Amino acid sequence: MKMPLTWGSWFLLSAWILNAGAEISITPEPAQPAEGDNVTLVVHGLSGELLAYNWYAGPSISLTFLVASYIVSTGDETPGPAHTGREAVRPDGSLDIHGALPGHTGTYILQTLNRQFQTEVGYGHMQVYEILAPPTVMANDTALVERRDTLRLICSSPSPAEVRWFFNGDALPVAVRLGLSPDGRMLTRHGVRREEAGAYQCEVWNPVSVSRSEPLNLTVYFGPERVAILQDSTTRTGCTIKVDFNTSLTLWCVSRSCPEPEYVWAFNGKALKNGQDHLNISSMSADHEGTYTCIAKNSKTLLSGSASVVVKLSAAAVAMMIVPVPTKPMEGQDVTLTVQGYPKDLLVYAWYRGPASEPNRLLSQLPSGNWIAGPAHTGREVGFANCSLLVQKLNLTDAGRYTLKTVTLQGKTDTLEVELQVA
């Protein structure tokens, strides 16, 4: 009486009867399946009339790794301990895996039994590739100081995959790739450079899937460098800037710096109340002659730099002259009769309404620096150390000729006239 063949009985038989001439091979279709694909482990090289198949998912023939046993004559399939609920054996011995998962990756063994109760064994390997989720770029810091700080970027992904890096949308430059770890997941740059500031991304990939991270933006602080003072926001630079009397001048402080530096201006060594990148002189006079210095300070790098320039009246402005400011004053306004090129060794001066005679004297300045009112003073005139005369709240009767008389320490006397018009 023949005993029926069961998976348990033939598993025991197969453990000791082996046909040494086995040439069975196993290949997956598709060859590089993605997770979720239906995969068939196709068997090649089967010979003779076969009674049964055993499929194993593991490195050896062991009950622990048994996926399923299949009886050819009846079509009965019995799942084993390693069956995941997705496997099915075909009559030709191939194994279908429905919706394969990365966990199905590994070695597969097919064991066959023929009518002589001999077994043959075939081996194959299958790699199920994940559909990769976007990785994340993590940094030790996203704002670093040039040549001082170290940059460390990590491409974080839960999946085993190849890694590529991108910088500002392009493949990472060769020089930067030198800082990659062997697995490509960590990028290290000692003494980071300004040209390495930008957007970094990493991309994970396998034969069936590619996924790129969101960009991580890196800022590299540097400077200030090449601090310079420009005239009127142009490229005109130099140690000395010559300006015509009563004209305007704008000095611009420029530098190469990230972030934009803080600015401090000084005039002849004395700090000015100006925190801007430019300094305006609205009406050039002898009082504005001197050395202007701009100091640029970077709060991130803790570095600073400075530049200086000498501002002088132009040669054409050296001769003494009087210019009303504003040039066309209106009734009710104040006007300053500004003196250009007044003597540096001035002893005294006097202003007159009309010709230089005592009854017409408005005011005069004494060697002490104080000024005293003259017979023609109306109470609206004020004198300054630079010889200028302020006339307040003009009326139409203030129009006419004004005369300035100066005396130097050497006794040189000069007289200068100006015609004031009041609109």
From Swiss-Prot:
All residue ranges annotated as the Ig-like C2-type domain in the record: 134-219, 224-310
Keywords: Disulfide bond, Glycoprotein, Immunoglobulin domain, Repeat, Secreted, Signal
Localization (cell): Secreted
Tagged with keyword Oxidoreductase: no
Cystine connections: C155-C202, C253-C294
GO biological process, one term: sensory perception of sound
Glycosylated residue positions: N38, N217
SMART domains: IG, IGc2
GO cellular component: extracellular space; stereocilium tip
Single GO term (MF): identical protein binding
UniProt region (Disordered), positions on chain: 77-96
Nucleus listed as a keyword: no
General function of this protein: Required for proper hearing, plays a role in maintaining the integrity of the tectorial membrane.
Name recorded for this polypeptide: Cell adhesion molecule CEACAM16
Species annotation: Rattus norvegicus
